[in-house]
Amino acid sequence: MTATTAESGNLLPLVSGRSRPPRHLADLSRDERRAVATSLGLPAFRADQLARHYFTHHLRADDADLMTDLPASIRPALVEAMLPRLLTPATALDCDGGQTRKTVWRTVDGAKIESVLMRYPQRATVCVSSQAGCGMGCPFCATGQGGLTRNLSTAEIVEQVVDAARTMAARTTAEGGLPGGPGRLSNVVFMGMGEPLANYAALLAALHRLIDPAPDGLGLSARGLTVSTVGLVPAIRRLAGEGLPVTLAVSLHAPDDELRDELVPINTRWPVAEVLAAAWEYARVTGRRVSIEYALIDGVNDSPERADALAALLVGQLAHVNLIPLNPTGGSSWQASAPRGQRVFVERLRARGVAATVRDTRGREIAAACGQLAAEPPVRSRAGR
């Protein structure tokens, strides 16, 4: 089946035959949540109370007994109507001394998605999926090699973040927390499975749920949110006008159309010049620096000449290059650039006035690093919870 997405007007492949996930309060506006409460014969403010338990205290249906401001007699109906279980953890894998955790989730219709929580000394970041699979077909990405199953709902996206916030708030590892004690989730990056801008409506609603204060959302800082895209130009321009100062990350991976057509197939539709023009418009409108994502592939896109070509495109722009040594996947024979090649690439960019750093890779051994989601991890370090 091919569907036209309302968010960008583009024809993108979707797989038919999947049921829609059940209604969840994270899918609903405040007025819609209140309407559900009144349809149950309850005062509208009961919906606000339930939403506070979810967004502020990260409570789930299993925690209904903790919602003591709700009369016990109404909890079952209210929870059933607006807090269905959308994601079930199938497997959780830890590495980096327990500071990185990948969770494999099963949706109610059996689709598989993954999220990754990473704890750093000064922050905690969760990488979330926006689709089950991906239809962009990038040959070095495990998700792209597997194809697209379906878009995620707003609530399915938000649930990944709420689970991460719940994990960070846990007091001990026995309660499901990470080593180091309780903390606060500070950053969300839409760099998991899927192309976020191909699921624009759900993405936009999810961003509002993450930013808006309780009882409408988690109250995270918009500046701690990053949306990654392979370059869906109409959607980039549309996002620029939404009034949300989130960071835009463009998965560029090549400075020229000939190579990028091979690495990022959507480039045949929106070439490098158009993608970067939209990115610079985004930076101008939002005042936010654009992150240019560039996977360093040995002998493919890591030559000094391509570093110079990339610098020529970016010099003078509000941009930062995030260089990512390619992470291995089973479907690709390409390898990461050698450390010396990485250093040379960075040095040539910086010498031409372009800010650039090499990403601190997390989770490679459990297939949780960039480009590895949906790849088979070589070591299983933790059973499902």
From Swiss-Prot:
Keyword Transcription regulation: no
Miscellaneous: Reaction proceeds by a ping-pong mechanism involving intermediate methylation of a conserved cysteine residue.
Keyword set, alphabetical order: 4Fe-4S, Cytoplasm, Disulfide bond, Iron, Iron-sulfur, Metal-binding, Methyltransferase, rRNA processing, S-adenosyl-L-methionine, Transferase, tRNA processing
Cofactor(s) demanded: [4Fe-4S] cluster
InterPro entries: Aldolase_TIM, Methyltransferase_A, RNA_MTrfase_RlmN, rRNA_lsu_MTrfase_RlmN/Cfr, rSAM
Biological process (GO), any one: rRNA base methylation
NCBIfam families membership: rRNA_mod_RlmN
Region span, Disordered: 1-24
Reaction catalysis annotation: adenosine(2503) in 23S rRNA + 2 reduced [2Fe-2S]-[ferredoxin] + 2 S-adenosyl-L-methionine = 2-methyladenosine(2503) in 23S rRNA + 5'-deoxyadenosine + L-methionine + 2 oxidized [2Fe-2S]-[ferredoxin] + S-adenosyl-L-homocysteine; adenosine(37) in tRNA + 2 reduced [2Fe-2S]-[ferredoxin] + 2 S-adenosyl-L-methionine = 2-methyladenosine(37) in tRNA + 5'-deoxyadenosine + L-methionine + 2 oxidized [2Fe-2S]-[ferredoxin] + S-adenosyl-L-homocysteine
Function field: Specifically methylates position 2 of adenine 2503 in 23S rRNA and position 2 of adenine 37 in tRNAs.
GO cellular component: cytoplasm
Entry protein name: Probable dual-specificity RNA methyltransferase RlmN
Gene Ontology molecular function: any one: tRNA binding
Taxonomy, superkingdom: Bacteria
Binding residues for S-adenosyl-L-methionine: G194, E195, S228, S251, L252, H253, N327
Protein family (similarity comment): Belongs to the radical SAM superfamily. RlmN family.
Chief place of localization: cytoplasm
Binding site for [4Fe-4S] cluster: C134, C138, C141
Ranges where the Radical SAM core domain occurs: 120-364
Catalytic residues in the record: E114 (proton acceptor), C370 (s-methylcysteine intermediate)
Coiled-coil stretches noted in the UniProt entry, renumbered to this chain: none
Disulfide bonds: C127-C370
Location within or outside the cell: Cytoplasm
Cofactor detail note: Binds 1 [4Fe-4S] cluster. The cluster is coordinated with 3 cysteines and an exchangeable S-adenosyl-L-methionine.
Pfam families attached to this UniProt entry: Radical_SAM
